[in-house]
């Protein structure tokens, strides 16, 4: 039983990480589409994101499982990966776009005034501020990603929640479920917070060096 539970916890952890990383990349690309100067690209990005974000994750998984894949027991991990990644990405796009809008135009102009290129301005001025402004919501999205992996059991994925359902002592199963999800969520919060702080410190150091020059 312990091995079964640990195996389920491993599947949940794996799904959470790979889905969240993939969703972040898709979200960044879609956000870039939102910010594009090309009206066609901007419209496509907004329409696509508007459709995906309105589909519940459970419905999306069933869509991939029963219509696209043809068999809900065939490639269940792959189905869960694709469906959950797209759903989380649609939500992250709004988070990233909000972070971009939070950067003051005056700071961008100041960076260009001291001789920074567009790439330097983005990586050393805009990106750190975007990260700093979205970290709290980004952490919440990581926790949400972890929580919705539980719907993957519908298509046959033996994730953490489905393995604890088999425990005869219902109270013990609930406690183990809470402990497992809390562990993954806490670890994710720690990593994301540390990454945000490191980027903020690097940005301040770069600006100080630029001012000295």
Give residue ranges: language-model regions.
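Transmembrane alpha-helices and adjacent helix-loop boundaries
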Residues: 1-213
């Amino acid at each position: 039983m312990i091995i079964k539970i640990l195996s389920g916890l491993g599947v949940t952890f794996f799904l959470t990480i790979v889905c969240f990383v993939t969703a972040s990349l898709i979200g960044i690309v879609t956000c870039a589409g939102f910010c594009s100067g090309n009206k066609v690209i901007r419209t496509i990005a907004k329409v696509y994101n508007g459709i995906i974000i309105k589909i519940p994750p459970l419905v999306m998984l069933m869509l991939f499982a029963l219509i696209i894949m043809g068999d809900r027991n065939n490639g269940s991990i792959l189905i869960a990966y694709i469906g959950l990644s797209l759903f989380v990405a649609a939500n992250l796009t709004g988070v990233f776009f909000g972070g971009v809008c939070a950067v003051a135009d005056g700071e961008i102009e100041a960076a260009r005034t001291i001789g920074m290129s567009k790439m330097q301005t983005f990586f050393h001025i805009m990106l750190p501020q975007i990260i700093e402004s979205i970290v709290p919501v980004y952490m919440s999205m990581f926790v949400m990603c972890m929580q919705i992996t539980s719907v993957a059991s519908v298509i046959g994925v033996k994730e953490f929640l489905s393995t604890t359902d088999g425990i005869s002592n219902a109270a013990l199963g609930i406690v183990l479920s809470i402990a497992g999800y809390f562990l993954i969520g806490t670890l994710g919060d720690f990593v994301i917070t540390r990454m945000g702080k490191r980027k903020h410190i690097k940005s301040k150091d770069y600006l100080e060096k630029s001012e000295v020059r």
